[in-house]
Curated annotation (Swiss-Prot):
This is Pyrroloquinoline-quinone synthase. Pathway: Cofactor biosynthesis; pyrroloquinoline quinone biosynthesis. It is an enzyme of class 1 (oxidoreductase). It comes from Gluconobacter oxydans (strain 621H) (Gluconobacter suboxydans). It catalyses: 6-(2-amino-2-carboxyethyl)-7,8-dioxo-1,2,3,4,7,8-hexahydroquinoline-2,4-dicarboxylate + 3 O2 = pyrroloquinoline quinone + 2 H2O2 + 2 H2O + H(+). Its EC number is 1.3.3.11. InterPro entries: Haem_Oase-like_multi-hlx, PqqC, PqqC-like, Thiaminase-2/PQQC. One of its GO terms (molecular function) is pyrroloquinoline-quinone synthase activity.
Amino acid sequence: MTLLTPDQLEAQLRQIGAERYHNRHPFHRKLHDGKLDKAQVQAWALNRYYYQARIPAKDATLLARLPTAELRREWRRRIEDHDGTEPGTGGVARWLMLTDGLGLDRDYVESLDGLLPATRFSVDAYVNFVRDQSILAAIASSLTELFSPTIISERVSGMLRHYDFVSEKTLAYFTPRLTQAPRDSDFALAYVREKARTPEQQKEVLGALEFKCSVLWTMLDALDYAYVEGHIPPGAFVP
């Protein structure tokens, strides 16, 4: 590929999101449009918990490699957003409020015993990607947050409208993300616009975002196959 201007690079990143972000997945359309039953929503929340719980570990692997205090301070905030600054705070704790509200046993959720194999493989692949790839690629892989405010708004409004078993309280995880995600993506986008200075680096950045979109899409493929089409693998959560 030829060298892109920063604006051209950003345009291609946004095009990847328009084509590949998981708000386009059929399972998410069903979730937002009220087409799932409570058991299927439970399965989604249970499996998504593993992703939420591993985000701080993913960010910690990158934090350890960042070369400046400025970058580390910025990335440390992401860990605090998810882990909280004291027990019972942060995004992971709020996600457990969602699984509690859906009637799932908290010990069972945290045990990870009911995960779909594809959930575990996909999330672990993402954590390993951030650990093993370049800092530039690792930061670029977080750019799905460019698109998350739209899906969060669709999800919250759709679920509140269609499901009587959720409330604003059980969906409290999503409210802070409406401000946290744009803040984080603004930083990551500015970083890749500045640091991706060669065609090879720009290709790496685009590939990282495509990879992350594939991780999220694959998780929904597995949920759809198991809990919509009815092919639950041995050992996974059975409603």
